[in-house]
Each structure stands twice: as C-alpha cells, then as structure tokens.
Amino acid sequence: ESFGLKQGHKTILQPTRIVRRKGIENAIDLVENLKDPHYKLLISHKAGDEGCEYAEWIKNYALKHGVDLRLAQKFISSPWLHQRHHLNGHSLWNVYAHADFVTFPSLYEGFGNAFLEAMYFKKPLLVNRYANFVNDIEPKGFDLVVMDGFLTPKTVARVRSILESSQQRQQMVEHNYRIAAKYYSFAVLRRMLNSLFTNFFGIDTT
C-alpha cells in the first residue's frame, strides 16, 4: 500500500538503481507491451551517484508510453543495514516477496546481485544477455526469459505466458532455485574458499 498498489495489481520489479547501464527502458517497454493496466512497474533503488538525468528521462519515458511507474526508494531501507526500525517497515526483501516478476535488462554487470536475489526469492526473471551472464551464468542451465539487447514479440509473449500460468511459473522458479543452490549457495562458497586456503596456505578451514 505504501507504493499505491492495490489488490489485483501485478508488480513487475526492477530491483536496481536508476542508472543507464541497467537498461530500465526495456522494463518499461515490456510492461507497455503486456497491455494490461493491472501491471505496475516498481523500481526499488534511487539514481545513485551518476546524477538524476537518466532517472528523469525514465520517468518521462514511462509517462510517454503509458506505463504506471512506481519509485520505491523513499520507502525501502537496505536489508544489510542493522537499523532498529526499517522505514515504514519495508526492506528490499519485503518487496521481492510481493513481486510477481523481476526484470534485469542490464547492458553490462560485474555479476548481478539482482539475479541471485530473484533466484533466492523464487521469482521468474527477464534478463538481458550481458557479457558476464553469457560467460558465467547462462551455461548453468537456468530457465529464464532472455533478451539479446532488445525485446521481441516472442519475449513479451513468454513473459505474459509465465505471468498467466501459476504452474509454469512454479516449475520455472523451483528449477532455478535448485540450479542456484548447486552453484551459488553458501555451502559451495565455503568449499571453494576451503580449497583456496588449502592450496595456497596448507590450511584446512573445515
């Protein structure tokens, strides 16, 4: 309710800062092409340290294309900060929990925290094929909606199909969760770190 969302609305979450390399105009184009006024685009973060010019352009772009855009940065506090009270009781994790679909159409990323967050919260995901995704993530076999630099009617149709089919959506996110747990869990990280310490220092940390 803090974001003006009501029962029956469907939340498309863009869980990133509003900076040019995030390709947020693609998320706007997606919502526009879904052609359903119940779909609302929610951006979780503020513009950050790259200025507000792109953020203003994004707001105008959404308005021009008839997309209901909600900006949540005033209502969300970081889940990593140990605050006595979250602002209005919301953290980024609350927003993920209530999202129906996640967009991550970045032009380039180091890795992409939002990708793993979507897997953890079992949310279907649209992702652009940025270089590190192609090299490091795509070969793992995730079931994703993938765009290659631009949206196509086929991409939009698949998103619509996923949003309208709870069975398809559940199969997709459960599959992705298993793959993410196999390759990116804390248990995997511990094994990798232990191997590094053993190889370099002869120390077994298990």
Tell what function each PLM region has:
Residues L5-K22, I28-V31, L41-I43:
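Conserved donor-binding/catalytic core segment of Leloir-type glycosyltransferases
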Residues C52-N94:
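Nucleotide-activated donor-binding/catalytic signature segment of Leloir-type glycosyltransferases, i.e.
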Residues D100, K122:
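A short alpha->beta transition loop at the rim of the catalytic pocket in nucleotide-sugar-dependent
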Residues F104, P124-N128, I137, L144-V145:
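Short hydrophobic beta-strand element within catalytic cores of glycosyltransferases
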Residues L107:
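Aromatic "clamp/platform" in nucleotide-sugar-dependent glycosyltransferases that forms part
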Residues G112-F115, F133:
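Short glycine/serine-rich donor-binding loops of glycosyltransferases
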Residues E164-T198:
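A charged, aromatic-enriched C-terminal amphipathic alpha-helix characteristic of glycosyltransferases
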